[in-house]
Amino acid sequence: MAIQHPDIQPAVNHSVQVAIAGAGPVGLMMANYLGQMGIDVLVVEKLDKLIDYPRAIGIDDEALRTMQSVGLVENVLPHTTPWHAMRFLTPKGRCFADIQPMTDEFGWPRRNAFIQPQVDAVMLEGLSRFPNVRCLFSRELEAFSQQDDEVTLHLKTAEGQRETIKAQWLVACDGGASFVRRTLNVPFEGKTAPNQWIVVDIANDPLSTPHIYLCCDPVRPYVSAALPHAVRRFEFMVMPGETEEQLREPQNMRKLLSKVLPNPDNVELIRQRVYTHNARLAQRFRIDRVLLAGDAAHIMPVWQGQGYNSGMRDAFNLAWKLALVIQGKARDALLDTYQQERRDHAKAMIDLSVTAGNVLAPPKRWQGTLRDGVSWLLNYLPPVKRYFLEMRFKPMPQYYGGALVREGEAKHSPVGKMFIQPKVTLENGDVTLLDNAIGANFAVIGWGCNPLWGMSDEQIQQWRALGTRFIQVVPEVQIHTAQDNHDGVLHVGDTQGRLRSWFAQHNASLVVMRPDRFVAATAIPQTLGNTLNKLASVMTLTRPDADVSVEKVA
């Protein structure tokens, strides 16, 4: 499967607002988001095309919500398998941990299998929507330098020609071996696992059983995963003394596959590849005008499928902030909140992935025996079983500082958490997901109240200049009540009753939602104005031009 890049004219001595190093998933997502915000973007990739073999196989609800934010989710969904369960098995085949959450609080299934090259291709094609975005393949980044107001990149083409790019900002999405990170001497702290795994992808799935199974066999742990489009992935631990070359030999590959298939000779191999699992975290995510994202900032073992999804979180968190800074709507201090918000959660996902790997393949054999016995007992405790079944162990992103205003008891506050995405009913009767009604914008969402009531004219002017959507949520039966309509306010019905439950639970009637769908603040009408002033301050927002007149509607 070859994904050719479009015929693009070279950019020699060109100036752009953002240069992105790396056309992997994080770089492509950054380019799509910035593209829809009107930012001039240039993506440079040293390969001559997208990587066309399967890599990541798990995409979660947060990543799908990110795809939705750039208008690509409907193109991505055909390459996914929703509600993809993960089951840990003992050597005898007994399931001791079943992970299959059935919740969709963010609008999408929490666990999904997917084919990464096809989703990457969707994102690359998505760039064609934006005349302000270009992607240059076969460009190796040889050097770069930072000045006070720009970054200069020096590239070499496949033909040996030199090109120079000047950008206001550089986003490094160039992978775990990031040239940008190494050039800046940013420590990449962590460790490399002592064992390796060989990944075998097979077409025309010879098993065709659903879900993903992690067999905790002390002789040789392995993974069996059903993927979309009839692809089967097997992963086998490489045992001490074995090499990739040995395992690639037909007789040894046949021996491996005979562990999981009745006829190991009758398969269509897509590829075989040995991986080393790393757990590393960059010490800094921002170095002046350079920002690290995705694997350039953090890498983790695959066992919870969170490497790809963590990169999507980086892109969603960073892109809207970078757009505001470039548009002059916020000072560049806002970009410091990127590391402040993302680094701790990335570390939590690394720790979770390492723990899952130790469950699959404990360092000591006695630990596996203990695991099997304890898990058997815990399965008889319903709260513990639900804890795993509903994936409550997954650290949900929660920010305690950054671009937000937290007041009251931090432990139970929704501030710094992702807001829910239920279905809402529009005034024309259409039912849609909440984000579709908001777009790539801030939102001030009020339960039953006019969100403009507690705002001054100056505040309305400032937040409208950011593209903020003001939304009044009412019970669905009230959607056509004229007395509740206010100019400049979107009126939506609470189709599923989830928004009413959310506001009741959190003792607030107004929420300020950021473009990345995180709760920046909560309030009631009488405190909203003061809260927005605090939020504008912590986000270092600039004031709009004074000659822009805005009429407040009470």
From Swiss-Prot:
Any GO molecular function: FAD binding
Top-level taxon of origin: Bacteria
Disulfide bonding pattern of the chain: none
Keyword terms, alphabetized: Aromatic hydrocarbons catabolism, FAD, Flavoprotein, NAD, Oxidoreductase
Binding positions for FAD per the UniProt entry: 17-46, 285-295
Cofactors that this protein relies on: FAD
Pathway per the UniProt entry: Aromatic compound metabolism; 3-phenylpropanoate degradation
Reactions listed under catalytic activity: 3-(3-hydroxyphenyl)propanoate + NADH + O2 + H(+) = 3-(2,3-dihydroxyphenyl)propanoate + NAD(+) + H2O; (2E)-3-(3-hydroxyphenyl)prop-2-enoate + NADH + O2 + H(+) = (2E)-3-(2,3-dihydroxyphenyl)prop-2-enoate + NAD(+) + H2O
EC number(s) given by UniProt: 1.14.13.127
GO biological process: 3-(3-hydroxy)phenylpropionate catabolic process; 3-phenylpropionate catabolic process
Top-tier EC class: oxidoreductase
The UniProt record lists the keyword Flavoprotein: yes
UniProt similarity note: Belongs to the PheA/TfdB FAD monooxygenase family.
HAMAP family: MhpA
Purpose: Catalyzes the insertion of one atom of molecular oxygen into position 2 of the phenyl ring of 3-(3-hydroxyphenyl)propionate (3-HPP) and hydroxycinnamic acid (3HCI).
Name of the featured protein: 3-(3-hydroxy-phenyl)propionate/3-hydroxycinnamic acid hydroxylase
Protein species of origin: Shigella sonnei (strain Ss046)
